[in-house]
Amino acid sequence: NVTSSSALIVGDRVYVATSNGVDWSHTNIPSPLSPSWVALDKNTGELIGEDGSGASASALHAAWSSLTYGVIGGEETLIWGGTDGFCYGYSTQPERDEDGYDLYNPKWKVDCNEPHYRIDKNGKKVPYATPPGSSELIGTPVLYKGKIYCAIGQDPEHGDGVGRLSCIDGKTGNVLWKYTDVGRTISTVSVLDDLVYIAEYAGIIHCLDANTGKLYWTHDSFSRIWGSTLAVAGKVLLGNEDGDLLILDHGKKEPEVKTVNLGAPVYSSPVVANGTLYVATQTHLYAIGE
């Protein structure tokens, strides 16, 4: 599979996932010791360091999540959603190991799957790519007020399945709350005014309290969702596979929802820049002014 993450640039360093994982059989990992992400000098391309988590050896599918950077508790921190279903927190400085490799070793890691997603009640491993099975992280972890928000999901070809949205203390790695009434997602969450918005692949949008995980409302778009929500200017924007651009009111109350059909599936996420809304469908790019 392709490397489908976005590069993260911090100073003179570029952090990017490698997409390392399983082969065509989806059961064999050809390069279990290869890194899931690397850091390069943005000016020269020289390798600065690589992921030291060892996640590749336990890859469920591939390393697709983009990295996140922020200062948490006065410490520069990298956050990555793992191909093994764990979320990792790292220092921004690599350490040289005994073999001479410069590794970014995790300060903490959190399993973002429920235990029964991995092992059933009879003690047997739950098969991957089945509705009750464990998932990797594909969407980018989001940092908001020192907390990390991330959700699990799989390749859309695998269909629907169990999910989980986690809120993690970015400094300690402690799980502050979790929400399991959400299905698999490949979307990145949006957080605005202490509200979290998450869209699941099945087409349902959820709004929760960012501090407690309390659910305020859900909205079913009745179509698959590949992209991520955008919370801006009092609205929550999102496209779906039916080609609908959904416009929901931002807030705790059940939202008024408007839709504009763009004539082709929307697999991307809407973007606002310089007062213009950009939405890409499978056939067109729309630029919508104020």
Regions from the language model: what does each represent?
Residues N1-E290:
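Noncatalytic, solvent-exposed loop/strand surfaces
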